[in-house]
């Protein structure tokens, strides 16, 4: 995908996606700076570049996902590396204060942002950091960022992948998928909630539907049920649990399969259905509850996605969003569910930069405001 470079914005180049739970930041680090440019570069710009590229953690909660860095790409006619940084939305005031401390506002830079937080925190950027946000539509940014990242390739690796043999856990393996001809595509964006888009071309897409039961629901319920303190802790607990201790299965009701309607005995008939029994509540572990929560949320997303794919007549479904970060368990569940219930007609696809497409899409909007 070619990005116009007629109008080059002044450095630094950022794109922000301020979500309900996480802030995602894409930062372009130029590597083709001339001696003349370096001489003229103001101290505050050097300070920001050095701070962002020489650290992998910022404060107690900010993290640069080093493994996702895109090296030596060309953007707006400049060569550089693209960095990906995330931190909790509740820590955004600290980020704004850091920008103020590093004299960010003196650089006359353009700050493009998307996500609900671009509206919610606009006043804070202005009053605390003396910064003006240019707000961009989050679904536009999601689609543009996704198509751009897939087009530049992941340092020679495939950006897109799927799970082969999804129905056989011992043979299931991650495999690259060629997305050179991406249309049509159903994009399922799983953040705090879920949005589902039907993409027919780079300019022709629509939001089909969504659900409030997303990553925020998983972490919220897990925190209530298990006392976990973080997404990573919730996933760790889920990986050790058995959801069938909490869920009521078809076989618990029918004694086996419900053959007339093609329902296998292992299918979930009622999520958390076993928790109506006192003895079951007393024997279930926190790990079981975490696993059941993950399975409940993931199965619901998969079910809604499958219905949308059938209605829109699209057979490739790409799942993105930070709910899938370090969450191979859910990815394999989604891959299996789509393959099984569609009788092999639907393919679940995933992307390495799962949660950063909105931030990249915002970055791509820079020339429009320079």
UniProtKB/Swiss-Prot annotation:
Tissue: Highly expressed in the liver.
Active-site residues, Swiss-Prot/TrEMBL: 138
GO cellular component: cytosol; nucleus
MF (Gene Ontology): acetyl-CoA binding; ATP binding; pantothenate kinase activity; protein homodimerization activity; vitamin binding
Catalytic activity: (R)-pantothenate + ATP = (R)-4'-phosphopantothenate + ADP + H(+)
Enzyme Commission code(s) on record: 2.7.1.33
Predominant place of localization: cytoplasm
Class of enzymatic activity (EC top level): transferase
A Pfam family annotated for this UniProt entry: Fumble
Record carries keyword Ribonucleoprotein: no
Effect on the protein of changing residue 195 to V: Retains 30% of wild-type activity. Refractory to inhibition by acetyl-CoA. Exhibits a 10-fold increase in the Km for pantothenate
Keywords for the protein's UniProt record, in alphabetical order: ATP-binding, Coenzyme A biosynthesis, Cytoplasm, Kinase, Nucleotide-binding, Transferase
Result of changing residue 138 to A: Loss of catalytic activity
Xref: Gene3D superfamilies: 3.30.420.40, 3.30.420.510
Positions bound to acetyl-CoA: 192, 195, 207
Transmembrane regions listed in the UniProt entry: none
Keyword Protease assigned: no
Pathway in which this enzyme or protein is active: Cofactor biosynthesis; coenzyme A biosynthesis; CoA from (R)-pantothenate: step 1/5
InterPro entries tied to this protein: ATPase_NBD, Type_II_PanK
Subcellular location: Cytoplasm
Free-text function comment from the UniProt entry: Catalyzes the phosphorylation of pantothenate to generate 4'-phosphopantothenate in the first and rate-determining step of coenzyme A (CoA) synthesis.
NCBIfam families: panK_eukar
Family named by the database record: Belongs to the type II pantothenate kinase family.
Protein name: Pantothenate kinase 3
Organism: Homo sapiens (Human)
